[in-house]
């Protein structure tokens, strides 16, 4: 019947736009972020039912959301690449790897948070919701391929981080940390917006790939100026010198579980942003931004590890240590080779476990003593062998002592740097690694070598462990898990390195940059 044929054609014509829109959106790419979002909304709803309901249901909701996100990320691994949301997001292997680091850092941060929140009287529903919001922003930032999505994701992460830093409202140091973080972060956001506006004006598009092509065909002085603004924002997010001033104060004043997340999750998102922007947009200025990052890496490794020697607070010491660690990761970024990018991804995964393991020990010590001073750890081995062993292994790994996981992470970075003729970075990295070993071992020596009569007053009155207390079992799971991976992961580092290699091989952006770099070196 002619009428039926006309009807079918009309139906197909009406369905076609919807199908095209579905293909253009490809919403399945952000299914892991959807799981985190659902967990965040459920946490807020449960929190409305009262503190008792929140204490009972918020932890399992968070575990379910983050666990689901990790499973969905595993399913996306090596999947066919399709741009999402009209080209604003891409779930390539690089994005999946960094999103997994962010999600896992949040999961471990939550495990070490519950006892801390219970003892300090912090409402866990609001705290968990804000932390999940920061996680959502960080995960979206790892896969953003458009200036608009980059800015929205960046601000989602930043605003949630400001709230987390000042969450202990009655603590003057927490409020001070939040204010400093807000002021410096707002300035960084303004600088990024100015750089992004220059890029849009020069290219007429917000797509990072299209911007990179436009700058390759017609590089201009204004493009170089935009590079400076964008690089300043990236350096702020990864706490590179000289954009590091906020780090020690924020780390010292913020709640310790928040610091644990910022030191890993936020930093991982920052390095993912660096790869998307610098490698993706500024291929025309490859030599220039690599030179600038070489300077930042040298300054970060030197200042971070040298100033850490003089610290008396554990959190401030780890703050300067994290600045130095960022310098090590930048070696892989400057190399721009397949080995360099893979070593960068591997070291971020290793840093996740060894740094969060150290923070788990610090939290366990602080909730039992209320102290953060390094001198108060004197003689701790006599009263708490678990914290002593766990903190010692994590600090040795951060220092790069074999056969810990951190040693193999640094070896891969230094090998990639040497192969790419980055001799200055490798030499500075080796020297500053030796410096870092000194202050890490100083803490270990204080805990282990001190005689009982030389123990600090805090350790002498150290309370016995009650593992059945609310929030203690998850803390023990996180601590033991991180310490085991840190200690054993070095011996079994080959699968991790294979995973990092696959992350680079499954990312067209990095493969194009590697090929372009090879052509330039041959030419």
UniProtKB/Swiss-Prot annotation:
<dbReference type="GO" id="GO:0019684">
    <property type="term" value="P:photosynthesis, light reaction"/>
</dbReference>
<keyword id="KW-0793">Thylakoid</keyword>
<feature type="transmembrane region" description="Helical">
    <location>
        <begin position="94"/>
        <end position="114"/>
    </location>
</feature>
<feature type="transmembrane region" description="Helical">
    <location>
        <begin position="291"/>
        <end position="311"/>
    </location>
</feature>
<comment type="subunit">
    <text>NDH-1 can be composed of about 15 different subunits; different subcomplexes with different compositions have been identified which probably have different functions.</text>
</comment>
<feature type="transmembrane region" description="Helical">
    <location>
        <begin position="345"/>
        <end position="365"/>
    </location>
</feature>
<feature type="transmembrane region" description="Helical">
    <location>
        <begin position="147"/>
        <end position="167"/>
    </location>
</feature>
<keyword id="KW-0812">Transmembrane</keyword>
<keyword id="KW-0874">Quinone</keyword>
<keyword id="KW-1133">Transmembrane helix</keyword>
<feature type="transmembrane region" description="Helical">
    <location>
        <begin position="477"/>
        <end position="497"/>
    </location>
</feature>
<feature type="transmembrane region" description="Helical">
    <location>
        <begin position="221"/>
        <end position="243"/>
    </location>
</feature>
<dbReference type="GO" id="GO:0008137">
    <property type="term" value="F:NADH dehydrogenase (ubiquinone) activity"/>
</dbReference>
<keyword id="KW-0618">Plastoquinone</keyword>
<dbReference type="GO" id="GO:0042773">
    <property type="term" value="P:ATP synthesis coupled electron transport"/>
</dbReference>
<feature type="transmembrane region" description="Helical">
    <location>
        <begin position="255"/>
        <end position="275"/>
    </location>
</feature>
<keyword id="KW-0472">Membrane</keyword>
<comment type="function">
    <text>NDH-1 shuttles electrons from an unknown electron donor, via FMN and iron-sulfur (Fe-S) centers, to quinones in the respiratory and/or the photosynthetic chain. The immediate electron acceptor for the enzyme in this species is believed to be plastoquinone. Couples the redox reaction to proton translocation, and thus conserves the redox energy in a proton gradient. Cyanobacterial NDH-1 also plays a role in inorganic carbon-concentration.</text>
</comment>
<feature type="transmembrane region" description="Helical">
    <location>
        <begin position="29"/>
        <end position="49"/>
    </location>
</feature>
<feature type="transmembrane region" description="Helical">
    <location>
        <begin position="317"/>
        <end position="337"/>
    </location>
</feature>
<comment type="similarity">
    <text>Belongs to the complex I subunit 2 family.</text>
</comment>
<keyword id="KW-0520">NAD</keyword>
<dbReference type="GO" id="GO:0031676">
    <property type="term" value="C:plasma membrane-derived thylakoid membrane"/>
</dbReference>
<keyword id="KW-1278">Translocase</keyword>
<feature type="transmembrane region" description="Helical">
    <location>
        <begin position="424"/>
        <end position="444"/>
    </location>
</feature>
<keyword id="KW-0521">NADP</keyword>
<dbReference type="GO" id="GO:0048038">
    <property type="term" value="F:quinone binding"/>
</dbReference>
<keyword id="KW-0813">Transport</keyword>
<feature type="transmembrane region" description="Helical">
    <location>
        <begin position="389"/>
        <end position="409"/>
    </location>
</feature>
<dbReference type="Pfam" id="PF00361">
    <property type="entry name" value="Proton_antipo_M"/>
</dbReference>
<protein>
    <recommendedName>
        <fullName>NAD(P)H-quinone oxidoreductase subunit 2</fullName>
        <ecNumber>7.1.1.-</ecNumber>
    </recommendedName>
</protein>
<feature type="transmembrane region" description="Helical">
    <location>
        <begin position="182"/>
        <end position="202"/>
    </location>
</feature>
<dbReference type="InterPro" id="IPR001750">
    <property type="entry name" value="ND/Mrp_TM"/>
</dbReference>
<dbReference type="InterPro" id="IPR010096">
    <property type="entry name" value="NADH-Q_OxRdtase_suN/2"/>
</dbReference>
<feature type="transmembrane region" description="Helical">
    <location>
        <begin position="123"/>
        <end position="143"/>
    </location>
</feature>
<feature type="transmembrane region" description="Helical">
    <location>
        <begin position="57"/>
        <end position="77"/>
    </location>
</feature>
């Amino acid at each position: 019947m002619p009428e039926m044929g006309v009807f079918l054609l009309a139906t197909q014509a009406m369905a076609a736009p919807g199908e095209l829109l579905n293909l253009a959106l490809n919403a399945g790419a952000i299914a892991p972020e959807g799981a985190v979002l659902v967990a965040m909304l459920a946490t807020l709803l449960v929190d409305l039912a009262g503190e008792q309901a929140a204490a009972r249901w918020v932890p399992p909701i968070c575990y379910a959301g983050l666990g689901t996100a990790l499973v969905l990320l595993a399913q996306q691994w090596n999947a066919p690449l399709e741009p999402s949301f009209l080209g604003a997001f891409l779930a390539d292997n690089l994005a999946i790897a960094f999103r997994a680091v962010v999600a896992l850092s949040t999961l471990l941060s939550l495990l070490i948070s519950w006892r801390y929140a219970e003892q300090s009287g912090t409402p866990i529903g609001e705290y968990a919701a804000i932390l999940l919001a920061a996680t959502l922003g960080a995960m979206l930032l790892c896969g953003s391929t458009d200036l608009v999505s980059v800015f929205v994701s960046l601000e989602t992460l930043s605003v949630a981080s400001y709230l987390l830093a000042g969450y202990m409202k009655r603590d003057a140091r927490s409020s001070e940390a939040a204010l400093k973080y807000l002021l410096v972060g707002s300035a960084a956001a303004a600088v990024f917006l100015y750089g992004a506006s220059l890029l849009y004006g020069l290219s007429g598009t917000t797509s990072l790939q299209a911007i990179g092509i436009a700058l390759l065909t017609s590089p201009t002085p204004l493009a170089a100026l935009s590079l400076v603004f964008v690089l300043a924002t990236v350096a702020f997010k990864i706490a590179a010198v000289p954009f590091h001033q906020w780090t020690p104060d924020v780390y010292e004043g913020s709640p310790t579980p928040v610091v644990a997340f910022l030191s890993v999750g936020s930093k991982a998102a920052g390095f993912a942003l660096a790869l998307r922007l610098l490698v993706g947009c500024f291929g025309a200025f490859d030599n220039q931004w690599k030179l600038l990052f070489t300077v930042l890496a040298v300054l970060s490794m030197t200042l971070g590890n040298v100033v850490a020697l003089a610290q008396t607070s554990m959190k401030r010491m780890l703050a300067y240590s994290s600045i130095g660690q960022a310098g090590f990761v930048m070696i892989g970024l400057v190399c721009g080779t397949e080995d360099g990018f893979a070593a960068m991804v591997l070291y971020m995964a290793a840093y996740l476990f060894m740094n969060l393991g150290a923070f788990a020990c610090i939290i366990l010590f602080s909730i039992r003593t209320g102290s953060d001073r390094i001198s108060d750890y004197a003689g701790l081995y006599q009263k708490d062998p678990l914290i002593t062993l766990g903190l010692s292994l994590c600090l040795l790994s951060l220092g790069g002592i074999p056969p810990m996981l951190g040693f193999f992470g640094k070896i891969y970075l230094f090998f990639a740097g040497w192969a790419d003729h980055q001799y200055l970075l490798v030499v500075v990295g080796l020297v500053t690694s030796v410096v870092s070993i000194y202050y890490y071992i100083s803490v270990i020596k204080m805990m282990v070598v001190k005689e009982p009569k030389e123990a600090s007053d805090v350790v002498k009155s150290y309370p016995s462990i009650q593992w059945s207390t609310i929030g203690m079992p998850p803390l023990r799971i996180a601590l033991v898990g991180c310490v085991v991976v840190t200690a054993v992961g070095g011996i079994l580092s080959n699968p991790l390195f294979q995973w990092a290699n696959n992350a680079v091989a499954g990312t067209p952006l990095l493969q194009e940059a590697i090929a372009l770099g090879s052509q330039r070196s041959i030419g």
